[in-house]
């Protein structure tokens, strides 16, 4: 249950609920399985801390199972996306203290990507997405795991909170 900060395109995002491992992860073997001694695959090796030797992180296998299933059944995986940067209650403590929000559940929309699925909807920066298709969201992994079961073009319903107002927004997922 580790969280790490990732710098991408002049933005910071966070990977949460990762498995910390001492397995060596290098550019050629990231994406490979993290295997338990009994032979079970428990994660996908993803990232290492470049300033520390022998510390790597893996995405838990349950999050990537929909991707694996799609690859096995269809030979490919098309990643769907809403097109947002968002934080959850697991990440907010890692952000500087000027980010003043008390988030008990849901995910906080920090930014909407231009020309994304969310861009021309009623979703706004500062909204809190509490559920997708009636499935409660508490972490970005909850959202990611659900989106991985969808295809670009699929329609989803987001329940959001904006201040004291609750509303439902329907959007068609984009392709990442």
Describe the role of every protein-language-model region.
Residues 105-113, 130-133:
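Acidic- and glycine-rich mobile interface elements
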Residues 150-152:
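Surface-exposed, short loops/turns at beta-strand junctions within beta-sandwich domains
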Residues 155, 166-168:
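A structural signal for beta-strand boundary/capping segments at domain termini and interdomain linkers
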